[in-house]
Amino acid sequence: MRRRQLLQRLMAGVMLATGLHLPAFASIEVAGVKFDDSVTVAGKELKLNGAGLRTKVIFKVYAAGLYLAEKKTTVPDVLTTSGPRRVSITMLREVSSDEFGKSFMEGLSSNTDKVERTRILPQTMKFGEVFAQIQTLKKGDQMLLDWIPGEGTQCYLNGKKLGDLMPDVAFYNAVLRIWLGDKPVDSSLKPALLGER
């Protein structure tokens, strides 16, 4: 394993030195969290589009990765892509579910208009019930937010399914805009998820 990492770093160094670029889809590490270059959601292979770090003030809160069927570099392309999608979040510090939920709602409100918020209100309330089941998100906890076409949004915590499916794609896209919208919760995370870093 160590030899493989050394070889990957050596190859990356050679590629940088010679002006070559790493492939668009490659596994990366963010703050000690490894994001695989591909995952399977609803029987479809998704590739890592980008990954980055969510910070608040000076604290590293979580590492997040976005998985899509093919590379997308603009927000409209990400939001209109067909097929499954995944956001993977790994906590880097302990956060109460109240604090995480509040940040989630602020991000949602900042990046949706009143009509959208009204449309997705029932699903937003369901999602709130999911957070009510969790006292604390601990360092190392992994949350997955999957969009499964024809079914809906499914949330997992450490591999365990949480809550019911939320069927409207508008809800999933509103969740994505927490990180990719005009007022993202972390301005440096947005370009990272779009693969710009």
PLM feature spans:
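Short strand-turn-strand beta-turns centered on an Asx-Gly dipeptide
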Residues: 157-159
